[in-house]
């Protein structure tokens, strides 16, 4: 990859503490990115709240800050270091959320910091439940029946229409954080309140339950020239309803027909191109082996 001549100093946001959705793979990928970018001649400024990581070792970045990952502290660091670019997508959900918040607050524009590795509007299309749903509708890709709620009261009304059990998915979270499956109104009130608090924008998707369907995934990579490749096809052994972090999986898929795999690949390519993902992306699908429905 040729070096961009308009960039000298790059700010990288670390993933912070190791929790569900913010696991050690982000530390590994962030460390490799720091090393690769430094070899290309870039100066690296790293911000991470977790000192117990490889990426915060003294020889990984040129300048390392062990600071809380929030907008105020990032703004202070940007003001002091004046990076030319921000690389947020190696910090997991924390990095993506902070990038969106910094952009919305006008910090990136004020200090002339360009975002590399991902576009800010791509984060919104992928993370905001309404935007993502509209994008899928334009592509003709079916999704589970769902509605967005901004309060517990709204969620209760939607769940009554969809019928219990339902799944709650907070926006701008990863790994199921703050959400879950609920079987009655009492559970919904507790989980929805937690999900609204966990969501960056106070938004929760109330979705029909499709437990028991096959859970299938594709890892795809797209570059800036719109070239897309499939890294692997993944078949979860346990059905939908069991968290992927607790499920065995096989790569490649062993029991899924070639026709279904081709359809999943077609959908994945449409999705990453529509959202304009640059880099790696995990696309998750549910497949009903009885009806053949894919969402």
Question: What function would you assign to each model-found segment?
Answer:
Residues 1-295:
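N-terminal beta-alpha lobe that positions the nucleotide/phosphoryl donor
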């Amino acid at each position: 990859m040729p070096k961009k001549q308009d960039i000298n100093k790059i700010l990288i946001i670390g993933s912070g503490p190791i929790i569900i959705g913010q696991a050690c793979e982000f530390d590994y990928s962030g460390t490799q990115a720091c090393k690769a970018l430094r070899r290309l001649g870039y100066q690296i400024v790293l911000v991470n709240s977790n000192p117990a990581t490889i990426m915060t070792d003294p020889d990984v970045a040129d300048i390392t800050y062990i600071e809380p990952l929030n907008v105020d502290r990032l703004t202070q660091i940007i003001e002091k270091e004046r990076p030319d670019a921000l690389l947020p997508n190696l910090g997991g959900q924390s990095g993506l959320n902070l990038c969106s918040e910094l952009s919305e607050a006008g910090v990136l524009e004020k200090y002339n910091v360009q975002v590399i590795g991902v576009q800010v509007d791509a984060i919104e299309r992928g993370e905001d439940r309404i935007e993502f749903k509209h994008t899928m509708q334009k592509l003709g890709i079916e999704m589970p029946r769902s509605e967005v709620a901004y309060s517990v009261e709204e969620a209760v009304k939607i769940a009554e229409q969809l019928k219990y059990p339902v799944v709650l998915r907070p926006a701008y979270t990863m790994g199921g954080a703050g959400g879950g499956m609920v079987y009655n109104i009492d559970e919904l009130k507790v989980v929805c309140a937690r999900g609204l608090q966990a969501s960056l924008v106070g938004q929760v998707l109330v979705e029909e339950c499709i437990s028991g369907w096959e859970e299938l995934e594709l890892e795809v990579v797209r570059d800036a020239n719109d070239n897309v490749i499939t890294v692997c096809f993944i078949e979860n052994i346990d059905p939908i309803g069991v968290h992927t972090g607790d499920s065995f999986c096989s790569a490649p898929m062993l029991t899924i027909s070639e026709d279904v795999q081709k359809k999943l690949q077609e959908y994945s390519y449409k999705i990453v191109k529509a959202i304009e993902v640059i880099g790696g992306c995990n696309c998750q699908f549910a497949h009903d082996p009885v009806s053949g429905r894919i969402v």
